[in-house]
A protein has these predicted regions:
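Hydrophobic transmembrane alpha-helices and their immediate loop junctions
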Residues: 1-177
Length: 177
């Protein structure tokens, strides 16, 4: 469990997977160490697994929204000196990147493929129906993943909803301030 693995920390190095990090540097997409859970410790397996599965994408959405608010505050109230325009632009671009990447992560993790939160969410919400089709999903998951990566599917399944969330968070942050 995360406690025994030393993962109950905000230190990012405890969560870095070296191969995933190298892939980020090489191809722009990578991964962190997966968070292991012990379903045997759950009091209500479906309900508690659902909570765990929703927590990741929800955290991504909260981070995206807070970064959008931060961006608007910095921009609207001129919290960064206009004399250092390049520094201001860099900070705003980083903040917008945080909004974008967290929207993409939330949407991606909601895809119902084994290993992603969307798979667990569907399994927990519709256990009897899901078990009827899960064998097929497991059998063809590699083919589905390859098709997802090498075709424009990713752009539509992840890109379009991510872009909509990004714009929504920026619009809401703009309307607040």
């Amino acid at each position: 469990t995360p406690k025994f693995q030393g993962r109950l920390t905000l230190n990012p190095f405890a969560h870095v997977d070296i191969i995933g990090f190298i892939m980020i540097l090489l191809v722009g997409f990578g991964w962190a160490k997966p968070v292991e859970i012990n379903p045997a410790a759950f009091k209500n397996r479906n309900r508690d697994d659902l909570k765990v599965s929703i927590a990741g994408p929800l955290a991504n959405l909260i981070i995206a929204f807070l970064a959008a608010v931060l961006t608007v505050i910095i921009y609207r109230f001129g919290l960064l000196s206009m004399e250092s325009t390049s520094i201001s632009n860099i900070i705003i671009k980083i903040s917008l990147y945080i909004v974008n990447i967290n929207c993409m992560l939330a949407v991606f993790n909601l895809i119902p493929l084994p290993g992603l939160d969307g798979f667990h969410i569907l399994r927990d919400l519709f256990p009897s129906t899901f078990y009827k089709i899960s064998g097929t999903v497991y059998r063809y998951q590699l083919i589905i993943l390859v098709l997802f990566v090498v075709t424009p599917l990713a752009r539509y399944i992840v890109g379009v909803p991510s872009y909509m969330l990004y714009n929504m968070f920026i619009s809401i942050a703009n309307s607040i301030f």
